[in-house]
């Protein structure tokens, strides 16, 4: 594992060399494939040192981080062609990737917290530096304040653990019980609920997505939302008793919120905002499954996190491809795209159907496991879950039908084809999404 961290470190100087944009991208893909070959049976912790170690959950998420970062560089070709500070841009992406790899392989709670917060900085720079509208400053402030405000109690909780137990190693803390202190439970969990994001504290996400460049949206939807889920997975190994007592609050909020957000999706005219709100709905069901703390729930939430990372990232790429041609994200202008870019309609269809968890995508596997776990936790949730599944299909269909069908916008006088780069980009999102269900033991057999 150390070899990958060092390779990433030595790639930093490459980002400042002239015309090394595609070289760095190829190196990230090389890194991904080397990391894939490196997979041994990681059901136990595979230690690098006292502070770093890997297990199956971290492995999948690190692999996803490598993959999405390679695809980010591929999607942001415009930064390179317009010479828009591309060296700094590549450096930001590499720095973010470095922070994410360290976050997912941290074994000490404090180091996890440190890298978890540090990954916010390059994301903020991506939004502020390469975003499209002046409102990106407001989006950046929202992102920063929501995350930092919720993370301060987490830091205090970590220091309390250090003070009372004299260790911060995840593996050693498993021996202790933290059942008697409810405030600690709240402080340790809340930061991750904001990062997920849970309904009621989700407002920063649509703002950040709408203002971010395509690379920012991809990494935000693909990896940064998964940090919250990963943190909860790690924390609930310590907070099991409190979790059984209090988790029903968050589950109820998430499920009701998921349905409300799905209704919000059906009223969106902005492509990016629609995809961002659909992320909140998906993360609501992931959060609910995770908080049931059952085997099905944990494995299903992990599977859906990986699947959503690929699917939602691909949808943001599609929205960006349309945005580059049309100059607008509005559904009122991006309509009748079947006439305008017929070659792209297939990809719209495939990724929208992935978003509604149609077979054979990995989303299906995740959602079925989550439905199982949440219904086994309480059968009353069936009402909300049935609404959630129905509206999930409804807004995915709405997105596809409104953007592809109908009369083409009268201001468009030309016909456009995608480039090979764009098709490869979409292919690399869609293939893993559908092939992973054939190798689902990685998602389902890691506990």
From Swiss-Prot:
One of its GO terms (biological process) is electron transport coupled proton transport. GO terms for molecular function: NADH dehydrogenase (ubiquinone) activity; ubiquinone binding. The chain crosses the membrane at residues 28-48, 56-76, 89-109, 110-130, 141-161, 183-203, 213-233, 246-266, 273-293, 298-318, 331-351, 374-394, 409-431. Disulfide bonds: none annotated. It is a multi-pass membrane protein. Its main location: mitochondrion. Keywords: Electron transport, Membrane, Mitochondrion, NAD, Respiratory chain, Translocase, Transmembrane, Transmembrane helix, Transport, Ubiquinone. One of its GO terms (cellular component) is respiratory chain complex I. It is found in: Mitochondrion membrane. It catalyses: a ubiquinone + NADH + 5 H(+)(in) = a ubiquinol + NAD(+) + 4 H(+)(out). Its EC number is 7.1.1.2. Pfam families: Oxidored_q5_N (PF01059), Proton_antipo_M (PF00361). The keyword Ubl conjugation does not apply. InterPro entries: NADH4_N (IPR000260), NADH_UbQ_OxRdtase (IPR003918), ND/Mrp_TM (IPR001750). It comes from the Eukaryota. Belongs to the complex I subunit 4 family. Core subunit of the mitochondrial membrane respiratory chain NADH dehydrogenase (Complex I) that is believed to belong to the minimal assembly required for catalysis. Complex I functions in the transfer of electrons from NADH to the respiratory chain. The immediate electron acceptor for the enzyme is believed to be ubiquinone. This is NADH-ubiquinone oxidoreductase chain 4. The lineage of its organism: Eukaryota, Metazoa, Ecdysozoa, Arthropoda, Hexapoda.
